Curated annotation (Swiss-Prot):
PANTHER family: GLYCOPROTEIN HORMONE ALPHA-2
Annotated disulfide bonds: 31-89, 48-103, 57-119, 61-121
GN (gene name): GPHA2
Name of the molecule in the record: Glycoprotein hormone alpha-2
Organism: Homo sapiens (Human)
One function term, GO molecular function aspect: hormone activity
Major location category of this protein: secreted
């Protein structure tokens, strides 16, 4: 049987790697949209309520920690001996979606909620919204 050329083998391995990765989005590093079910109520008693699939941002972003440079040590009075850099999975774009609420009887209401439109790895913040 004749051997395949090196170009054919490289192409085959590339196609194999791409098709294997299609079903593994959760394993891919980064920050991605992730759907979840949310129940919306008009008040605490649940007079009107409805459900909707909203989008969240879920994933892993890069972080690292390393010994601080000498200039950082001196500037901090030798208290800042470790420097860490990190990013968090963050919502970078929102959109409003309308949720239909079913009320007591046959009455209906409509309510707007926010859902994630886009995600990205960004600076970690205690509270952004």
């Amino acid at each position: 049987m004749p051997m395949a050329s090196p170009q054919t083998l490289v192409l085959y391995l590339l196609v194999l790697a791409v098709t294997e990765a299609w079903g593994q989005e959760a394993v891919i590093p980064g920050c991605h949209l992730h759907p979840f079910n949310v129940t919306v109520r008009s008040d605490r008693q649940g007079t009107c309520q409805g459900s909707h699939v909203a989008q969240a941002c879920v994933g892993h972003c890069e972080s690292s920690a390393f010994p601080s440079r000498y200039s950082v040590l001196v500037a901090s009075g030798y208290r800042h001996n470790i420097t860490s850099v990190s990013q968090c999975c963050t919502i970078s774009g929102l959109k409003k979606v309308k949720v239909q609420l079913q009320c007591v009887g046959s009455r209906r209401e409509e309510l707007e909620i926010f859902t994630a439109r886009a995600c990205q790895c960004d600076m970690c913040r205690l509270s952004r919204y």
